[in-house]
Amino acid sequence: VSLLFDEFIKLEKATEKVVVSPPQVQQPEIKASGKRIQVNLLDSLKANTTYTIDFSDAIVDNNEGNPLGNFTFTFSTGTQIDTMEVSGTVLDASNLEPIKGILVGLHSNLNDSAFTKLPFDRVARTDSRGRFSIRGVAPGKYRIYGLMDADQTFTFNQKSEVIAFNDSLVIPRMEERIRMDTAWVDSLTYDTIVERKYMHYLPDDLILRAFKEF
């Protein structure tokens, strides 16, 4: 995957921040040169699957270091792109503080054993506020888990790993909403208010509480 930007850019902590979904067991090679980012996916790609490459705030401009926040590139190996999103927050169960950098994943296999035996179907990573958004999700029913994935297997296989979960089934959906946009004449006077329709993805308020087994 080759991405061309309109200014010189660089990557910061790409191995920590960039998340490919579905997850890649063999970590991708990600390099920036001039105005271009090259992503080499080393795992075989699944057929008829939507892939997302979430850069978080890893892309910054070369001069001032300003991040291009929440940039995600999406492509499909099939004829359509899945567009559903699932969002929420991961909190430390002991003090309800947000947890940064924990992996959050969906399983379409609803058996509890899937968390320990199968890699996630789709993944995201939490930001500094503990927020996550899993993109490119297909319609269906899912279990959702959080995992501080020490060995990068995308499965819970070490009791030392921090985990999180939500008891409810996750069923992605979307609804049409209206956003009010204002056209201003100057800083004090507005000209018109325009209603714009957009699609909002749900659920967007999932709470996962993280803990470590003893």
Segments (PLM) and residue ranges:
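Acidic, low-complexity Ser/Thr/Gly/Pro-rich repeat segments typical of extracellular/periplasmic
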Residues: 1-129, 133-136, 141-147, 159-174, ...
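Acidic carboxylate motifs that coordinate Ca2+ or other divalent cations, activating on Asp/Glu
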Residues: 153
